[in-house]
Amino acid sequence: NRMDVAQQINALKEALADNWSVTVFPEGTTTDGKSLLPFKSSMLSVLEPPPPGVLVQPVVLDYGEVSEFIGWIGEEDGLNNAMRVMARKGSFRLRITYLEPFSPEEYHGRKAIAAKAREEIEEELGATLDEPLRDFRHTVEAIRYFAPDPKTGES
């Protein structure tokens, strides 16, 4: 809800004022590793105006071949995702690529900052995959609810 977002933004402002590094995941979730969702820029309003000396450093997290398994995709809740991933046998590789930091002062507003970061991440991810990113389509089948028959109790 909007109050939670405001509280999170205030916490980010306090952290930046205390010279802490902060991490924001602007997709808000994970994908299959072969696509990139639109960035939600609300948390980047902490950079309006940018605190002195603050830089934005885009980062790519690449789980390689297990991206679809690791990803939190669809209607799975957080606990079930964590249990599924932790129950997996063996190990998996995570490649972290730190891209060139940029000054948010060079961009006008949170949406422009988010667009710049997304552009950099998209370019790196595309180069890693050796193919263009595909459109991510989150589809959930409709579930129909039928009220039980009051006489029989059956749906």
What are the roles of these predicted feature ranges?
Residues 1-14, 90:
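Membrane-interfacial amphipathic helices and adjacent loop/beta segments
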Residues 8, 94, 109, 113-121:
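Short, hydrophobic-biased amphipathic alpha-helical segments
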Residues 11, 15, 46-49:
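Catalytic-core regions built around general acid/base machinery
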Residues 20, 32-111, 132-143:
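A cross-family acyltransferase "interaction/gating" segment
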Residues 116-120, 124-155:
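Cytosolic-facing loops and C-terminal tails of multi-pass membrane proteins
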